[in-house]
Amino acid sequence: MEHNCNIHIGQLIREQLKADQRSVGWLSREIGCTRNHVYKIFNKSSLDSDLIFRISKAMNFNFFQYYTAAFLENLKSRIGEK
């Protein structure tokens, strides 16, 4: 099974946190982890779906939308190949 998803979720979370003018300390408190762990999240290109859900809920932002968009784009290209 080919997995070709060019989403760097950690980077997207960092960018949204900055856009929301929220701190790393704020996010760490909201999701119940250390600031150091949040910095590690920023460096990860993929995360567990439960963690993405917790972050989405805390930030009131649907990070799953990036995966949905990538899935739909892939589906369109596969349909176009047939």
Which residues are covered by each model-predicted region?
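A detector for short, charged/polar N-terminal pre-domain segments
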Residues: 1-8
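Short, charged recognition helix plus adjacent turn
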Residues: 3, 15, 21, 40, ...
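Short basic helix-loop element that most often maps to the first helix and adjoining turn
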Residues: 9-30
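Residue-level detection of the helix-turn-helix DNA-binding "recognition helix"
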Residues: 18, 43-44, 57
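Residues in the helix-turn-helix
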Residues: 26, 37, 65
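Recognition helix of helix-turn-helix/homeodomain-like DNA-binding domains
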Residues: 32-47
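DNA major-groove recognition helix of helix-turn-helix/homeodomain DNA-binding modules
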Residues: 50-66
